[in-house]
Amino acid sequence: MIRNSEDFSHHLSRESKAREKGPFQMLGRIKSSTGIDAISFSSGLPHPNKFAIRELSIKFPQLGCFKEENGTYAKEVNVTFNIKADPSEGLLNFSQSLQYGQCQGISELVGFIKEHIRRIHAPRYENWDIKMSNGNTSGLEYCLRLLVNYGDHVLTEKYTYPAAITAMRALGVQFVSVDMDSEGMLPESLEEIMRDWDISLGPRPHVLYTVPTGQNPTGSTLSLSRRKKLLALARKYDIIIVEDEPYYFLQMEDYNGSLNPAQQKCDGSTFLKSLVPSLLSLDTEGRVLRLDSFSKLIAPGTRLGYITGNSMFIDHITRIAEVCTESPSGICQSVLYAMLHNWGQEGFCAWLQELQYSYTVRRNAFLNVANKYLPNSVCIYHVPRAGLFLWVELNLNHYRFSDTKKSVSQIEMEIFLALVEKGVKTVCGQFFMANPERSTKIFFRFAYSIADFEDFEEGIKRFTSVINEHFNVESRVRICP
C-alpha cells in the first residue's frame, strides 16, 4: 500500500511559514451552493476583444518524422490558434491562454505531465503534485525560498551550476561543497561532512542541491547504487534533496570510438528502462524536490519547466509564485500542449530518444577530435555519460611557469584569456565554484552541443596551441577512459 509523504513542515523557511494563500486565488474557488451561473464583477481581467494577439500559427515535426536533415523535417504539423475560433481537439482555448492563468499551470498540460511522471518515475508515495515553472533556474529559486533562511548552509557538489551559486548567494546561503569523482557526488564525503559538523558554525545543513545526471559542469552521472546511498544519508540526517535534472533524458551509451551510437532506437518502454532511476523514483518519503525543464527538450525560449514534490511543498511553492511570477506564459503552455497532445506519451518518448541519439553523435564526434589532438600528459578527462559537456583537467605539474608563484585561479584565468585571444571560448573551472580562491586544480568546460561539427577540429586545435604555449607537453597519444 502506497502511503502519503512524511511531514516535512519543520524544513519550511520563515518566509514559507509566513505566506498565506492569496485572497484572489481563494475567491476563484468559491461557488454558489445553488449552482447558478455567476455574473462576475470580482476580477480585474482585461476584455479578450482588446487582446492585441488574435492568431498564432506554429509548425512542429510530425510523429514518426523526428529525424532532421540540415535543420528541416520531412513532415511537419501546422497548427493555428485563433482567439475567436472554438478550440479543436488537442488545442486549448486561445482566449483563455492569453488571459491571467492558473498559477499551477494550465490543467490539460499539467495532466499530460503528471501522466509522463507516472510512466517514468512512478512516485512511491500518494500525495505528490507538480507546479509549472519558468524553467529550472526559476524552480530552484522557489525551492530555496521554500526551505532556506538567510545564513543557512546548503550542500552542493564541489563544482556546480553558476546560476545556482548566484541564486543562493543572493539569499545569504553559506556553501558546503561535497567532493566529487568521475561519477559525481561522493556519498563518503557527504557522510563525513554531516557526521563531523561543527555546531559552532550553526545548524547542520538540511538542504542538498545536486545535478545527478550529466552534471553541469563535469558531465558526471550518479549510478543507481550511489543514488541509493545519497537517499539513505538524506534519511539519516534529515536532508531535503533538490534534484535538478535538465539533462536526464540525454543519457548516453558507452563511447567506443565510432561516431554513431551502437544502440538502435527502441519502443518507449525499453527506452525508459534504459535510464538510470531518478532520485524522485527512489524516494518513499517525499523528501526529494525534482526540477525538470523543457529548455533542452523543446526550446529554452519557452521558459517552461515543472517542479515535482510532496503536495505540502508544492502548495507552499505555489503561494510564493502567486505573488512573484504568477503563472508561466499561457502562449508557451498552449504551444507546448499542442505538440505533446499531438505526439502522445509514446511520441514524446520517441522525440526524447531522437534527442538522445543526436547528442550522443555530437559527443562522439567531439571526443574523436579531442582524443586526436589533446595531449594526454596535460589533458585529463572522462567520457560523459549524459548531458552536453566535456570537463577537462589540465595537469598543473606540467605548467611551464610554475616559478611565478601564481595561484591556481590566476593560472586558469591566464589560460582562459589566452584562449579568447586565439578565438576559442570555453568556461573556466573557477566559474563553477562557490569559493574559487580555494581552487587546487585547473579545469575547462567544453559544450559540444552548439558548435558546428566542422568547427570541432579547428576549435580543439586552437585550444591545443594554447596548451603547448603554457605547458610542457610530452605526448599526444590518448586512449580515452
Swiss-Prot record:
InterPro entries tied to this protein: Aminotransferase_I/II_large (IPR004839), Class-I_PLP-dep_aminotransf (IPR050859), PyrdxlP-dep_Trfase (IPR015424), PyrdxlP-dep_Trfase_major (IPR015421)
Gene Ontology molecular functions: 2-aminoadipate transaminase activity; aromatic-amino-acid transaminase activity; pyridoxal phosphate binding
CDD domains the UniProt entry points to: AAT_like
Keyword Transferase: yes
Keywords for the protein's UniProt record, in alphabetical order: Aminotransferase, Cytoplasm, Pyridoxal phosphate, Transferase
EC nos: 2.6.1.57
GO cellular component entries: cytosol; nucleus
Gene3D superfamilies linked to this entry: Type I PLP-dependent aspartate aminotransferase-like (Major domain)
Catalyzed reactions: an aromatic L-alpha-amino acid + 2-oxoglutarate = an aromatic oxo-acid + L-glutamate
Cofactor(s) the record lists: pyridoxal 5'-phosphate
A Pfam match: Aminotran_1_2
Subcellular location: Cytoplasm
EC class of the enzyme, as a word: transferase
Function: Has aromatic amino acid transaminase activity.
Family: Belongs to the class-I pyridoxal-phosphate-dependent aminotransferase family.
Entry protein name: Aromatic amino acid aminotransferase C1773.13
Source organism: Schizosaccharomyces pombe (strain 972 / ATCC 24843) (Fission yeast)
Taxonomic path: Eukaryota, Fungi, Dikarya, Ascomycota, Taphrinomycotina
